[in-house]
């Protein structure tokens, strides 16, 4: 390593900046026309900023709160379940600048450094915590979609990560990336921006369609939009002795769960198992991870909620055998079965083609309809897009330290038969359309990043 590299990096002697690929990226970009990023942004603190730690006061009533985004939820596809930060605090002088605006670039700046998201139209009015750095591009100087694609590329990510400091919890600050060189790529910038914007629009449209599907189930079945503000609330109730022969825990018989069951019965509900829905859970086994060519893509219960679906690791093929109880199929309903109630447990994801063939973690339940009268999109919409479905899933949680959803209890949940077959197919079509849009969104974003990388490699031509 030449000593000039040390000089150019503030005489840093830790190995991070020199082994991450940042130096090579800077050397390549030095041969091109570039502009420091701070000259391409505008707004609070020059357009690149995070915040200071603050006391978080959460509320339950949406009228008095704003959705609050954290580093753990930044990359999720569905932001409708975010916690609510006090609106009074959020709109104060101290925190008002943490509001997210469309076309901002959001970067995690503490812990896992350099995870990024492009602020979509449905993120307007959401506040973020202090560990998410915001980059606000100046539209008169640069296209926001292009800048995002560049920062996500194999040239941008290493340079962002190279500025990290801290031995235990790593951080970056705005000044560490302010002078990051941004190459000017001519027409490719507009093309990359268009791809990123189309990807964002497809993601927003997908969310609207899923919301429409859930509302349709509620309307047809006469369900309220919201049964309770949380999965578990402090309350008291009574239950028939015949109903406590299998479950004696009070949370299973809480009044919200009882109400959810009652209105499902009123909608002529029958058990999922009687409706031809099969359930699968992966065996608990020693997990040996290998290179891609020797393994099957593996995903955890946290990974299924991500906007971008990619293998986290590859599970050794020989461990899986010929039995495919571990396999995710397209159109499965995936339910997170472990965790704390109020978190991801009981939340579900629609398996579009991106997840087909993945090996599922033992912490994921897979529900697979086999009866055409109950199409997969309808099953997903009832369980995962209505509060009634969620409350019925959450009530089945058992265990004191780390609750889990028993598969047999989940298959006993009643699904409404009130919707006519044509209405069920309509809901099914909506869910499938939403899945295709999410797949399209990911494909467009990958294309944009590849376009930027290819243009840089060709010298900006």
Place the predicted regions along the sequence by residue.
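Non-catalytic DNA-recognition/assembly elements of restriction-modification systems
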Residues: 1-54, 186-286, 419-461
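Sequence-specific dsDNA recognition surfaces
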Residues: 35-57, 72-102, 270-286, 302-330
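Short, surface-exposed loop/turn microsegments at beta-strand edges and helix-strand junctions
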Residues: 57-66, 81-86, 98-100, 118-130, ...
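Short hydrophobic-aromatic micro-motifs
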Residues: 67-70, 100, 105-108, 297-300, ...
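A short beta-sheet element
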Residues: 96, 110-149, 326, 330-383
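Elongated alpha-helical scaffolds
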Residues: 98, 102-105, 129, 142, ...
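A short glycine-rich beta-alpha junction/loop motif
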Residues: 126-133, 165-187, 357-365, 396-423
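Short, positively charged
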Residues: 144-171, 377-399
